[in-house]
Amino acid sequence: MHLSAVFNALLVSVLAAVLWKHVRLREHAATLEEELALSRQATEPAPALRIDYPKALQILMEGGTHMVCTGRTHTDRICRFKWLCYSNEAEEFIFFHGNTSVMLPNLGSRRFQPALLDLSTVEDHNTQYFNFVELPAAALRFMPKPVFVPDVALIANRFNPDNLMHVFHDDLLPLFYTLRQFPGLAHEARLFFMEGWGEGAHFDLYKLLSPKQPLLRAQLKTLGRLLCFSHAFVGLSKITTWYQYGFVQPQGPKANILVSGNEIRQFARFMTEKLNVSHTGVPLGEEYILVFSRTQNRLILNEAELLLALAQEFQMKTVTVSLEDHTFADVVRLVSNASMLVSMHGAQLVTTLFLPRGATVVELFPYAVNPDHYTPYKTLAMLPGMDLQYVAWRNMMPENTVTHPERPWDQGGITHLDRAEQARILQSREVPRHLCCRNPEWLFRIYQDTKVDIPSLIQTIRRVVKGRPGPRKQKWTVGLYPGKVREARCQASVHGASEARLTVSWQIPWNLKYLKVREVKYEVWLQEQGENTYVPYILALQNHTFTENIKPFTTYLVWVRCIFNKILLGPFADVLVCNT
């Protein structure tokens, strides 16, 4: 009886092993889906995509990885992969070469000069590069069994997920528009963050961008030793960024800003809807000034006095808000209905993007910190189409500042420096321009506490805000440009051996009849063929006869374009070749 039981148990074990051998491939896919399900929020729907494991493995082993990228250099490149893999043991991505592999661009060793692409939107930062290791697909036979990710993946780095300015400027805005750059990606993609940070203080904001829970690099190790993405996009669009942080040259606005307030406000509208924040605005007579209160450093020492003075000057109530004491949804709700936002310089001012049109931003700077040298929020507020007023106030009184030399270096302490350097910093009246990120004089000054000089602040605000601050309904402010003028032609007449006239005429751009434009002018460039210079004219009518310096029997080149409201310059029509 005992031997029979043992024999039966062994037989069951053998049969189980045989069955396992036949089903193990499908269970690899099931395992991944179970792991991903654990990472989802309770409200997240089940995945629409499932992996046929044997088929996926066959495609990878025979065909290999496929890559096609957009962008000419590593700083503006986004790549689309099929069957890109990631080794959790080596912590590197793998491109498997198979029979149908494609690698565009095929850079050879230039792929390492310095990288294929930037994983974050901070341009050309040597901690943010993406690359992969190459292997023949046949190497898969000697590697751990791959686990296939069923979701479309967007793979990127967050730059600094604990700082709200970096979260919005470097991550959320670029993620939002990268997801919309490719059809369907916003509704299908799962975000994979590979920089190695933990969730950070604002992880809930990243969750708003996709219906699927984002995954961190550390979580990938629980899914398998070798992960393979059936479909992945790698990199982020930098087109929405407006500021550079001073890694190569002192910080300031980007040289070529490509985003306007229109795109910022569409993103802000999306975020407020996801946060369930109302757009109704405040009733007439209940407008308020919102003051950001900091609780740990860079304090406003006379905050109560400031609140009272603002209320008296502008005849509206004042409200305080802080990131520490309010949910982010409450912060957005208060900012999006405020008439004026007042704050010390700091990451919380990125919430300026939620202010209503016509509102005012007042940024306060501690002693010795020049507002002209630190302008991420000014640049944001002044983007075309944001329609905000911006005010910068600087404490000019050393007696109104409280310093903290005894703190750790990263909170502005300077006691670790030699005495001569400490003395120099204490006597300095302005922090000189500097690179990011550990300049001790900058850290010492930016972490000061400030007693705001109320009269000088009110005077500074009043230079910009003449009446009662507050949101206002505005007409479309983003400039619409004219098209080309149409049917441009020229006619010449000669009077004697030395006198000639050249008449140029054209029709209005066809889109003008659909627009309400305050002022329409035309710019005409006149150039004698063979000369290097031209003569420009600004004209109000659609035709003009030129007589000055017009020579008989001469060829002239003529360009004409339309201008709206003095600043919106349309394209030149095709060049006219006119013979007198």
Curated annotation (Swiss-Prot):
It is found in: Endoplasmic reticulum membrane. It holds the Pfam family Glyco_transf_61. Residues 1-4 are cytoplasmic. Its EC number is 2.4.1.312. It comes from Homo sapiens (Human). GO terms for cellular component: endoplasmic reticulum; endoplasmic reticulum membrane. Residues 26-580 are lumenal. Glycans are attached at N99, N276. Changing P253L: In MDDGC8; no effect on protein expression; unchanged localization to the endoplasmic reticulum; decreased protein O-GlcNAc transferase catalytic activity. It is linked to Muscular dystrophy-dystroglycanopathy congenital with brain and eye anomalies A8: An autosomal recessive disorder characterized by congenital muscular dystrophy associated with cobblestone lissencephaly and other brain anomalies, eye malformations, profound intellectual disability, and death usually in the first years of life. Included diseases are the more severe Walker-Warburg syndrome and the slightly less severe muscle-eye-brain disease. Muscular dystrophy-dystroglycanopathy limb-girdle C8: An autosomal recessive muscular disease with onset in childhood, characterized by limb-girdle muscular dystrophy and intellectual disability without brain malformation. Disease severity is highly variable and some patients may be clinically asymptomatic. The lineage of its organism: Eukaryota, Metazoa, Chordata, Craniata, Vertebrata. This is Protein O-linked-mannose beta-1,4-N-acetylglucosaminyltransferase 2. Keywords: Congenital muscular dystrophy, Disease variant, Dystroglycanopathy, Endoplasmic reticulum, Glycoprotein, Glycosyltransferase, Limb-girdle muscular dystrophy, Lissencephaly, Membrane, Signal-anchor, Transferase, Transmembrane, Transmembrane helix. One of its GO terms (molecular function) is acetylglucosaminyltransferase activity. Residues 488-580 form the Fibronectin type-III domain.
